Swiss-Prot record:
GO terms for cellular component: cytoplasm; nucleus; U4/U6 x U5 tri-snRNP complex. This is Thioredoxin-like protein YLS8. InterPro entries: Dim1 (IPR004123), Thioredoxin-like_sf (IPR036249). It comes from Arabidopsis thaliana (Mouse-ear cress). GO terms for biological process: mRNA splicing, via spliceosome. CDD domains: DIM1.
Amino acid sequence: MSYLLPHLHSGWAVDQSILAEEERLVVIRFGHDWDETCMQMDEVLASVAETIKNFAVIYLVDITEVPDFNTMYELYDPSTVMFFFRNKHIMIDLGTGNNNKINWALKDKQEFIDIIETVYRGARKGRGLVIAPKDYSTKYRY
C-alpha cells in the first residue's frame, strides 16, 4: 500500500515538505517499506489520506534510503509516525512514555483519524505537546 502515498527520497525533500506546509499537519511515516509493521501502518495511512486531506498531508520516508534523521529522531523502530506543524515537531502523549512518535502499527482507521484531529487542533492552538484521545499505556494486555 505504500505506493499509494508520496515518498520523500532525500533529507532536503523531508525538510521542504515540513517547511512548505503552512496550514496543514504534516504526518511522516519513517520506516522500511518492506517491513510488516510498516505495511500495516501504510494501509491505515493510505485509507485515511483522502479523509484527512483538508487538514493533514501524509508522506513516507524509507530510513535506509534517507538516514539523515535516524539519530536526531531516534528512528530505530520498524515503523515510526511523527507529526509536524508550521516547521515544528508536535509531540503527542499517548501514555507510553515516548511523546515524540507513534512506533507501532495502528489497525483502526477511525482511531488514527481521531489522533490526527487531536494533534491538528492542539497544534493550531500553539501547543507543542498534545494529549491523545486514548491512553495506549495498556495496549498490550499482560
